[in-house]
Regions:
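A cross-family signal for N-terminal binding/gating loops and helix N-caps
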Residues: 2-244
Length: 244
């Protein structure tokens, strides 16, 4: 039986990677993250009005996995684009999110899967919901036209491709005077994903500069693809997964 929470709790990336190196290691990580993404893309957020049968289901259809390990031992996996992590200068450590906290930020909403005993050895793992579809067939009350969402939905076969619109899909369905809840529900069946995963949108490569600070690699430096906004070198990790 599928259960995203258990999958995350038992996930041990390094145990599965073992002695793999280079491309083999990268491919193994993609395979592991694909399983997590498939669990997420098979489930949905249930937004339910209090004391009512009125509800909306919000199904993620595209997610990006983010994974950053704190600390400086050699084999740590670094993903410096992660928002919720300790400062590089060591001046501010961020406490751990309990499993399943929704983290709202300028790019959208992350479902967070953090682990560890303290901020210094934390694993900062999350999934950014990049695209989603809304099933409001059971929304019996509080209906109103979510204009911008409707426009987006109709353009892409019911799929909303703007990640920040998830705020509205989750938080603007029902009145706070009645109250509502948001709960994750695992899918009954696994959905099929696109064969190939993709790179994450506008995620740059990082390097350490001469002062040993972590900085983004500019598009003008070296060869390779630039990010969609043309400012930086694109990070090549294919951690973006989509429903077929």
């Amino acid at each position: 039986n599928m259960n995203l929470k258990e999958e995350i709790k038992t996930l041990d990336l390094h145990a599965q990677i073992g002695d793999l190196k280079g491309v083999d290691k990268e491919n193994k990580i993609v395979e592991i993250f694909r399983n997590v993404a498939q669990q997420i893309l098979s489930g949905y957020f249930l937004v339910q009005k209090n004391q009512s049968d009125s509800c909306v289901k919000v199904h993620p259809t595209c997610v990006e996995i983010y994974y950053h390990e704190e600390g400086d031992r050699g084999d740590k996996i670094k993903d410096y684009i992660v928002y919720h992590r300790n400062n590089d200068d060591g001046k501010m450590d961020k406490s751990l999110f309990p499993l399943g906290i929704l983290h709202n930020h300028v790019s959208g909403i992350d479902m967070t899967f953090e682990k560890g005993d303290n901020p210094q050895d934390a694993i900062r793992m999350s999934a950014l919901i990049r695209e989603f579809r809304m099933d409001d067939s059971k929304k019996l009350e509080d209906n109103y036209c979510m204009d911008y969402l409707e426009l987006k939905r109709n353009r892409r076969g019911n799929i909303v491709t703007k990640p920040t619109y998830l705020y509205d899909a989750l938080y603007s369905q029902f009145s706070v005077f009645d109250g509502f809840s948001i709960q994750w529900v695992d899918g009954e069946n696994l959905v099929e994903l696109e064969e190939e995963s993709e790179v994450r949108v506008n995620v740059p490569q990082f390097k350490r500069d001469e002062r040993n600070m972590v900085v983004k690699v500019l598009a003008s430096e070296g060869d390779g693809d630039a990010t969609a906004n043309k400012m930086y070198r694109q990070c090549l990790r294919k951690w973006n997964f989509k429903v077929k």
